[in-house]
Amino acid sequence: MSQTTVRAESGEPSRRAVLAGGAAVLAAGTLAAKAQESGRPGRAIKNGRIRQSIVAWCFENHWDMDQIARVAVELGCESVELVAPKHFPTLKTHGLSCAIGTVDMSPDPPFAKGFNNPKYREQVLKATTEAIDACSEAGYKNVICFTGMREGIPDDVGATNCVEGFKRIVGHAEKKGVVLCLEMLNSRVTDHPMKGHPGYQGDHTEYCVDIIKRVGSPNLKLLFDIYHVQIMDGDVIRRIKQHRDVIGHVHTAGNPGRGELDAKQELSYPAIMEALLEIGYRGVVGQEFIPTRDPKQGLREAVTLCDV
């Protein structure tokens, strides 16, 4: 029997039923209001308590960099992120920043090689140094970094190697005023190369946090990717509060599927954004979903939803 049909002996609805029904109506009303707001033209960001950014790679199949920048401005976002330094002038033309810079490990993706593997250490050091220098020169404050793939390396050895590698580069980051943000990625999803990363060593939140704390620098922090954390560890809001001191950047996407932040996915993004505000997070939230329909409408919905 549904809770909403349970009645007390008097024949009246039970208190639990009334409260449950009221909560459901309130939640539905809030989501409906957000959905209505997202359909309106103009700026999607009204409150501005959550600073927002568009992650470029997700939309490069739909728009060039100038178009991505124009969409960011239209929605009220302050940044387009994970872009190569050659695109920094385009961002500046539109009055945008790059909330977090990328590392060029081409021809491989940047997460494929990291400090966990000594044979890549010099390559990672060089690429990370170049990224730090480029972002510092442009006035941008964050650079992404990764553990790398396991390739047979035990987790404890990989962590120790990461600590040693980050200790070699973090002093340069401190000197340049740049924060390295270590991203945790999920290793479970196997049906798409950018929805999951089987073999990635830093595939749990606490594993990455341990590395960060062992390095012991304020210029190495955690990139808290809500989508990846949900898949591997869950308990997203509790982990945000638990690791409040080391969160340097945040990414979004709907789960399952890494799609839009809509009713087809399981994460409550307004509640998660409120948790970020509660811990005093002052960084940027990057919208990093892979669009399955009109990309601008999906972005408008996501930005509106996170504008708590």
Regions flagged by a language model, labelled:
Residues 53-63, 111-123:
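Active-site mouth loops of central-metabolism enzymes
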Residues 78-84:
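A short beta-strand-loop structural module common to alpha/beta enzyme folds
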Residues 88-90:
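Active-site-adjacent beta->alpha loops and helix N-cap segments on the catalytic face
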Residues 2-73, 81, 139-141, 192-193, ...:
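Histidine-acidic metal/acid-base catalytic patches
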Residues 73, 92, 136, 174, ...:
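Anion (oxyanion) recognition and catalysis
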Residues 23-29, 44-46, 113-221, 231:
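Active-site acidic/histidine proton-transfer and metal-coordination neighborhood
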Residues 60, 86, 104-109, 149-151, ...:
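Feature marks short, surface-exposed loop/turn motifs that line or immediately flank catalytic pockets
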